[in-house]
Amino acid sequence: MSRPLATSHDTTPSQLCPPELDGDRLPVHVAVIMDGNGRWAEARGLPRMMGHRAGVEALKSTLRLCSDWGIAALTAYAFSTENWSRPGDEVNFLMTLFERVLQKELRTLEEEQVRIRFLGDLDALPLKLQELIGDATERTAANDGIHFNVCTNYGGRRELVRAAQRLARQAANGDLMPEDIDENSLAAELFTAGEQDPDLLIRTSGEHRISNFLLWQLAYAEIHVTDVFWPDFNAEALKRALLDFQSRSRRFGGLDPLTP
């Protein structure tokens, strides 16, 4: 990346955060559905692949902003289990793009203390990409900066089925009593185990759906939808999303504290 991701040692996130935002009321964990790459390219008379390239730059910028502004975790929906149904040349391009970006950016991620994890059924990915993912995960595991989760070959329903199978296997082996299965034990079997659930979901391109993304984890997340295509998502768009988040009263199923 051309600029540092994480906050420098002599500058605090509160100093970098836009003054319109309350630095004490930022979401801890932001999730993004990066939609609109193809339409962004088509609107400019470009191949869809160019939209994906531009989308990578938007993701790099968003990661940098989240780190600088004091957001602890960013989870991005990069490639869903349904995306395999796209044209083969587009899928192949995306796999190659993932490989090239990892090879190019890993050193910077290490230097800036970003901890990166890839969430999903990774065994179905090309072998070279699997190796790069394993290397990146291992080399950044001890980093204490922003947590960057990249959902790759990920599907929320498949994740829940996988978790249920793992719990069933434990019960069948006598390691877990069925009546002891609770929310915590199921959450521990999800790809996101150990990560706080997202406080805010941002979806670009104006689509109002969650597309099989983090079905369990988004139970109490605030949702912000913007008409901006993902390649055009920038600091102003992120600030608007965070202002929207800070305008909400999060009740988690209860009453507003101000309600008599």
From Swiss-Prot:
Cofactor(s) in the UniProt record: Mg(2+)
Binding sites annotated in the UniProt record for substrate: 36-40, 48, 52, 80-82, 84, 86, 203, 209-211
Residues annotated as binding Mg(2+): 35, 222
Region of interest (Disordered), ranges: 1-22
Keywords assigned by UniProt, alphabetized: Magnesium, Metal-binding, Transferase
Active site: 35, 83 (proton acceptor)
Its EC number(s): 2.5.1.-
Manner of cofactor binding, per the entry note: Binds 2 magnesium ions per subunit.
UniProt-recorded Gene Ontology molecular function terms: ditrans,polycis-polyprenyl diphosphate synthase [(2E,6E)-farnesyl diphosphate specific] activity; magnesium ion binding
InterPro entries tied to this protein: UPP_synth-like (IPR001441), UPP_synth-like_CS (IPR018520), UPP_synth-like_sf (IPR036424)
Biological processes, Gene Ontology terms: polyprenol biosynthetic process
Transmembrane segments: none
Assigned protein family: Belongs to the UPP synthase family.
Alphabetized PANTHER family for the sequence: DEHYDRODOLICHYL DIPHOSPHATE SYNTHASE 2, DEHYDRODOLICHYL DIPHOSPHATE SYNTHASE FAMILY MEMBER
Subunit structure: Homodimer.
Function description: Catalyzes the condensation of isopentenyl diphosphate (IPP) with allylic pyrophosphates generating different type of terpenoids.
This protein's name: Isoprenyl transferase
Organism of provenance: Parasynechococcus marenigrum (strain WH8102)
Source species taxonomy: Bacteria, Bacillati, Cyanobacteriota, Cyanophyceae, Synechococcales
